[in-house]
Amino acid sequence: MDIISVALKRHSTKAFDASKKLTAEEAEKIKTLLQYSPSSTNSQPWHFIVASTEEGKARVAKSAAGTYVFNERKMLDASHVVVFCAKTAMDDAWLERVVDQEEADGRFNTPEAKAANHKGRTYFADMHRVDLKDDDQWMAKQVYLNVGNFLLGVGAMGLDAVPIEGFDAAILDEEFGLKEKGFTSLVVVPVGHHSVEDFNATLPKSRLPLSTIVTEC
């Protein structure tokens, strides 16, 4: 299946078949999608909670109580539920961790190359955390890059998913102690196979025309 076919076929799943689970291979592949998403300067300012047990999904679904109860069944019935979390502040230790991993993965031929890479990434990090003072927003944008990459990727795997912002982040952050770890939850994405109750699966896709959204020059 080519990438355009995937983009045209995938949809936001409104109901999941609780009896259909991801295979062990598929479960590993969705984690690989999370790991290899692009991010600005390869900063990777994220963490993910992958819930696949009934207990784990129930913990995530606590955030769908009250106002967001309409999203509860999606979280409980999906095979897996991924919580996308962003760092709340960029720190030097994280930048060092990234460049050290790049070195371990063989991306630098010389110490000077490593130093130059680290200097460049730190420049952009400082632009946001020192000058613009919007590093939390900058890092959230990187997580959304991951969400988009993930949705297209699981679609290419023949799986169904839905991005959810309708949840109580404060409840979810507390449930998993995210604030203490320097993260906050941004998006919840249930993954699995849609059920016959998924009305959105049979509706035609609707998008604004290219003439409205694209300027060519």
UniProtKB/Swiss-Prot annotation:
<feature type="binding site">
    <location>
        <position position="67"/>
    </location>
    <ligand>
        <name>NAD(+)</name>
    </ligand>
</feature>
<comment type="similarity">
    <text>Belongs to the nitroreductase family.</text>
</comment>
<feature type="binding site">
    <location>
        <position position="71"/>
    </location>
    <ligand>
        <name>NAD(+)</name>
    </ligand>
</feature>
<feature type="binding site">
    <location>
        <begin position="10"/>
        <end position="14"/>
    </location>
    <ligand>
        <name>FMN</name>
    </ligand>
</feature>
<feature type="binding site">
    <location>
        <position position="71"/>
    </location>
    <ligand>
        <name>FMN</name>
    </ligand>
</feature>
<keyword id="KW-0520">NAD</keyword>
<feature type="binding site">
    <location>
        <position position="74"/>
    </location>
    <ligand>
        <name>NAD(+)</name>
    </ligand>
</feature>
<dbReference type="GO" id="GO:0046857">
    <property type="term" value="F:oxidoreductase activity, acting on other nitrogenous compounds as donors, with NAD or NADP as acceptor"/>
</dbReference>
<keyword id="KW-0285">Flavoprotein</keyword>
<dbReference type="InterPro" id="IPR050627">
    <property type="entry name" value="Nitroreductase/BluB"/>
</dbReference>
<protein>
    <recommendedName>
        <fullName>Oxygen-insensitive NAD(P)H nitroreductase</fullName>
        <ecNumber>1.-.-.-</ecNumber>
    </recommendedName>
</protein>
<keyword id="KW-0560">Oxidoreductase</keyword>
<feature type="binding site">
    <location>
        <begin position="205"/>
        <end position="207"/>
    </location>
    <ligand>
        <name>FMN</name>
    </ligand>
</feature>
<dbReference type="GO" id="GO:0005829">
    <property type="term" value="C:cytosol"/>
</dbReference>
<comment type="function">
    <text>Reduction of a variety of nitroaromatic compounds using NADH (and to lesser extent NADPH) as source of reducing equivalents; two electrons are transferred.</text>
</comment>
<feature type="binding site">
    <location>
        <position position="107"/>
    </location>
    <ligand>
        <name>NAD(+)</name>
    </ligand>
</feature>
<dbReference type="InterPro" id="IPR033878">
    <property type="entry name" value="NfsB-like"/>
</dbReference>
<dbReference type="Pfam" id="PF00881">
    <property type="entry name" value="Nitroreductase"/>
</dbReference>
<comment type="subunit">
    <text>Homodimer.</text>
</comment>
<dbReference type="InterPro" id="IPR029479">
    <property type="entry name" value="Nitroreductase"/>
</dbReference>
<keyword id="KW-0288">FMN</keyword>
<feature type="binding site">
    <location>
        <begin position="165"/>
        <end position="166"/>
    </location>
    <ligand>
        <name>FMN</name>
    </ligand>
</feature>
<dbReference type="GO" id="GO:0046256">
    <property type="term" value="P:2,4,6-trinitrotoluene catabolic process"/>
</dbReference>
<dbReference type="InterPro" id="IPR000415">
    <property type="entry name" value="Nitroreductase-like"/>
</dbReference>
<keyword id="KW-0521">NADP</keyword>
<feature type="binding site">
    <location>
        <position position="41"/>
    </location>
    <ligand>
        <name>NAD(+)</name>
    </ligand>
</feature>
<feature type="binding site">
    <location>
        <position position="14"/>
    </location>
    <ligand>
        <name>NAD(+)</name>
    </ligand>
</feature>
